[in-house]
Amino acid sequence: MITYPAEFNARKEAVFTALAQVDGGGHRLRFPMLSFRDFPQTQARVVASLSRAKKQPKGRLGAALKRWLVRGQYNGARRYFLRHPDRVAVAWNGLGGSRAAFLQGARDAGAAALHAELAPFPGRITLDPVGVNAESGVPQGPEFYTDWAGQDPQRSGD
């Protein structure tokens, strides 16, 4: 069963709904899980998540509030996945901000985590346990693909 934060984008929500159906069910988190009892790794995870956040807070108050929110989300996700280690955390992109804190909380609790993203092929989605784009688990260089294609004559195409 997958667990994923609610998305306010119909396409992303449809991807998670379909994935949940294939995986035998899903738990959509309408609101972020929050906990303010820290783990030893909390501060480092918050700093890492915020350093990559798309929307950086403006001013000291905004930064403090964002740190507080991401801290609560990391701790909340970690506690949730400690209680549900059989669930798989899935988030769109998940390299920065709240989604990164969610996925890292799951990983630190021992649960599996997947990053979802549009694939380089039309109409396809990538699910990757490592990351997305240049940080994905997909080989980046052409050597892997040419070696793979060379192993079977039917794999060489136009």
Predicted feature descriptions by range:
Residues 95-104:
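An aromatic- and histidine-rich active-site surface loop
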Residues 1-78, 82-83, 118-158:
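Conserved N-terminal ligand/cofactor-binding loop architecture of enzyme catalytic domains
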Residues 1, 105-108:
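A general secondary-structure boundary signal
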Residues 80-96:
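Short N-terminal targeting/anchoring amphipathic segment
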Residues 89, 103-106:
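Conserved catalytic-core segments centered on acid/base and nucleophilic motifs
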Residues 107-123:
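Active-site proximal beta-strand in glycosyltransferases
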